[in-house]
Regions:
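C-terminal accessory domains and tails appended to enzymatic cores
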Residues: 42-175
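Short alpha-helices
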Residues: 1-44, 163-166, 170
């Protein structure tokens, strides 16, 4: 949008401004891997990178915004990007990780899901939706944890929490 306004008024961005325009588009769409990517923005980013001699491949990697789980506690991991929802009187929470590679199933199951089960009790939640975006393979793992069990879903692309995942979760509570 900012770039479009600059074009409309005839303003030519500096190299630093062009870089910031590209970064803002990439960060918002997980380096154009997200389902909410607008293909015209990809073309604009490539054009600007070429025009201003910016390293497009470096920017793609930089803008993945990977979660530094090696420096985080389990509590920080399971609450990263946490949001709360009220779906028809049911309390639901979600959190996510953006990782280059998904950790082993033993870490996910024995450490993270175990901690999520405790978090459900502690916060009196109906459900905790834990999302892992695996950037290396362009996959999304959705883990729905309730007091009654765990349901896991795997998707062959990077989904949007707000656009793709949570609206489906909301429908679970609408019925």
């Amino acid at each position: 949008l900012i770039y479009e306004i600059m074009q409309l008024v005839g303003y030519k961005p500096s190299a630093e401004e062009a870089k910031m325009i590209i970064v803002s588009m990439m960060v918002d769409t997980t380096s154009f891997k997200s389902s909410k990517t607008i293909m015209e923005e990809v073309e604009v980013a490539k054009k600007l990178a070429y025009e201003y001699e910016l390293d497009y491949d470096y920017l793609i990697k930089y803008c993945l915004c990977l979660t530094p789980i090696d420096k985080m506690t389990v509590e920080e991991i399971i609450t990263n990007g946490q949001k709360y929802y009220d779906y028809y009187g049911y309390k639901v929470s979600s959190a996510y990780l953006q990782l280059y590679e998904k950790p082993s199933d033993s870490i996910v199951n024995d450490v993270w899901i175990k901690a999520l089960r405790e978090k459900i009790k502690e916060c009196h939640l109906e459900m905790y939706v834990f999302i892992i975006f695996e950037m290396e393979k362009d996959k999304t793992y959705e883990i729905r944890v309730t007091e009654n069990g765990v349901k896991k879903f795997e998707y062959p692309k990077i989904l949007s929490r707000g656009k793709d995942i949570m609206p489906v979760v909301e429908k679970v509570f609408a019925n």
